[in-house]
Amino acid sequence: MERISFGAFLSPLHPLGEDPGLSLWRDLELAEWLDQFGYEELWVGEHHSAGWGTISSPELFIATAAERTRRIRLGTGVVSLPYHHPFMVASRAVQLDHLTGGRFTLGVGAGSIPSDMHFLGIDPADTRRRTAESLDVIHRLLTGDEPVTRVTDWFELHDARLQLRPRRASGLPLAVSSAVSPFGMRLAGQYGAAPLSFGVPPRPGSSVDDLAAQWQHAVDSAAEHGRTIDRADWRVALSVHVADSREQALDDLVDGWMRYRNEYWALLGTPPVHSRTEARKALAELIDRRSTIVGSVDECIDAVRDVQEATGGFGRLLVNVLDWADREAMKRSFELFARFVAPRFNGSLDGVTASYGWVAEQARAQRAAAR
């Protein structure tokens, strides 16, 4: 299988009870940890209601995180296009491209929280049309030299062009999110953008195998529009927790996962669990079908390999940042993953392994010759 690189996806989703302002600073501290541990990307979401997701402007968060990190790439995960004028999205994206020294990726999507849409007077049935209209304009602004004029029922542009241009001649990296329907994957294929799949929803019958069909939608759309799309650019976001053993990992997670299931996903109609025993059983089922990756280092290596094979291959695995475990257990999980799981897939062990093997072979040959 092809190599995989690794990043993190920060919605964020913080359970009620903790000071929300302090949570923002803790999220910035997390960005520093990820940078130090060698994660290649951090994606930051946009939410405006429901209490758990409190980053309303991923661009502002990224501008701050860029000052506190050195290497990690930072992306909006995602800007909800129906909520914003497309010229402003494109203009701010290019500014971030410059402020981050070229470390920014513009991730876009249709939005997912009905209450956010209600606040803004947006019909949920209209979000896909708005997303497609907006992305067409954004793509033209970011890649073309001609002024853009476009009049719709929700935005207007007249002879619009960007003052700042992307830093690189190849343009500003662009990603499109996908959850369940083919819409996001087809849009990614249409523009040759990187698909960003939000893993597997916690509903009966869903499994990691569904992701393979998602990828095919992107391939088909790209072909229809005369473009190609590379699996190496496909991001897949999954929940991951590494501990010394599966039992320890479950102990770390079960209470936080139960709150997440019963409080956050309940808003979306997911049935609750009623005890820690029931929660452990439900969580174990998610692990067994690879919707969530939890366990020891070796178990997580096997699970990543299984997901890679089930999907047909992808380029980047994004670890969901969820407050299921306490702070220290979460930090240790990210560190264990970076030290012992990621190297099995990103090629960083190839040189030292080959060198050790060569020296060992030479030593065996010398001992044999001395007999």
Swiss-Prot record:
Reactions catalysed according to its record: 4-hydroxyprotoasukamycin + NADH + O2 + H(+) = asukamycin + NAD(+) + H2O
Source domain of life: Bacteria
Pathway annotation from the record: Antibiotic biosynthesis
Gene null: resulting phenotype: Mutant accumulates 4-hydroxyprotoasukamycin.
Pfam families associated with the record: Bac_luciferase (PF00296)
Gene Ontology biological process: antibiotic biosynthetic process
Cofactor(s) for this UniProt protein: FMN
EC number, as in UniProt: 1.14.13.-
Co-factor binding comment: Shows a preference for FMN. Activity with FAD or riboflavin is 3-fold lower.
One example GO MF annotation: oxidoreductase activity, acting on paired donors, with incorporation or reduction of molecular oxygen
One cellular-component annotation, GO: cytosol
Keywords: Antibiotic biosynthesis, Flavoprotein, FMN, Monooxygenase, NAD, Oxidoreductase
Top-level class of the enzyme under EC nomenclature: oxidoreductase
Biological role: Involved in the biosynthesis of the antibiotic asukamycin. Catalyzes the epoxidation of 4-hydroxyprotoasukamycin to the final product, asukamycin. Can also convert some 4-hydroxyprotoasukamycin derivatives to their asukamycin derivatives, but cannot use protoasukamycin as substrate. Can also use NADPH, but catalytic efficiency is 20-fold higher with NADH.
UniProt record similarity statement: Belongs to the bacterial luciferase oxidoreductase family.
Protein name as it appears in the record: 4-hydroxyprotoasukamycin monooxygenase
Organism lineage: Bacteria, Bacillati, Actinomycetota, Actinomycetes, Kitasatosporales
Underlying gene: asuE3
